Amino acid sequence: MDNQKGALFPDEVILQILARLPVKSLFRFKSVCKSWYRLPSDKYFTSLFNQLSVKEQLLVAEVSDSSSLICVDNLRGVSELSLDFVRDRVRIRVSSNGLLCCSSIPEKGVYYVCNPSTREYRKLPKSRERPVTRFYPDGEATLVGLACDLSKNKFNVVLAGYHRSFGQRPDGSFICLVFDSESNKWRKFVSVLEECSFTHMSKNQVVFVNGMLHWLMSGLCYILALDVEHDVWRKISLPDEIRIGNGGGNRVYLLESDGFLSVIQLSDVWMKIWKMSEYETETWSVVDSISLRCIKGLVPGIFPICQTGEYVFLATHKQVLVYQRRSKLWKEMFSVKGSSSLPLWFSAHAFRSTIVPCN
């Protein structure tokens, strides 16, 4: 920081204040002085900023009649985010620690990783997979994952699915392509996995914790996890109450909760939040049970999108709701005006506002 006589606050206090600003405001203040201009690229400051920002979860969603995304913040309300800087028509596939992985709409097989807060992006090189080998059944990867490691300022993109050679039946091989941001290269490994199936929401809600990417299997068999450093797949058990009862007719969703793996179980009248308190032993515990009686009419079409220990964001066809866990109050944060072709929950993702380079 620039030393100035008569400064009101010590440098560290100023850094703590600046680290709590939205990224947009922080970049606006770069013109104040040289030291503030350098902050977004300063390792100490970006680490401090990211440590604070990961404690908050935002919700981003595409609105069908708008070219921008809505961004819903528990404290600051609703704002807009644009992906126009990517210079392609894209759709969000997954989110991780402030980065979004998007696929090109006009050109199949083209992927981008971008940070909408800093408006930086990287177009990923195409893998060297031969065109005679393709993902089954529709030519696209079954799973898309993004693992953003804030401690190392790096990310991995994962494309995985069953492959078949052209003109042949699938042979059961589960192919995984992993992009490494440091080497700017793809690597490939092949596993033998029993046939896995996933819902639209379980593909959207990919959770990166403990160096692993996690997807919830449809049928509530287990959670499929990938160690992105060692290229190893692992199966993680769900809570016995969910697994043995096959969900008991309830809907179950996989989320993160303050760095822990979490599942949310929805019945007609209750929302039960589970947290994996011990990862290695796969120990689950119930941390909250929330009555849904006051939003009973919305329950059949409501989906939890993201959460912290303080609140839960949920989306319906046309609304975004927040539940405050301490006060036990519900609040509508956003509502689509007029008709909407796609439901909000279909394109809603957890998001964080971080300073992570992606180019």
From Swiss-Prot:
Instruction: Give start-end ranges for the coiled-coil region(s).
Output: none
Record remark: domains: The F-box is necessary for the interaction with ASK proteins.
Name this protein carries in UniProt: F-box protein At5g49610
Q: Which stretches make up the F-box domain?
A: 3-52
Q: Name one Pfam family in it.
A: F-box
Note the PANTHER family from the entry.
BNACNNG10540D PROTEIN, F-BOX DOMAIN-CONTAINING PROTEIN
Q: Which CDD domains match?
A: F-box_AtFBW1-like
Q: Which keywords, in A-to-Z order, does the entry hold?
A: Ubl conjugation pathway
Pathway(s): Protein modification; protein ubiquitination
Q: Which cysteines are joined by disulfide bonds?
A: none
GO biological process: one example: protein ubiquitination
Describe the subunit structure.
Part of a SCF (SKP1-cullin-F-box) protein ligase complex. Interacts with SKP1A, SKP1B, ASK11, ASK12, ASK13 and ASK14.
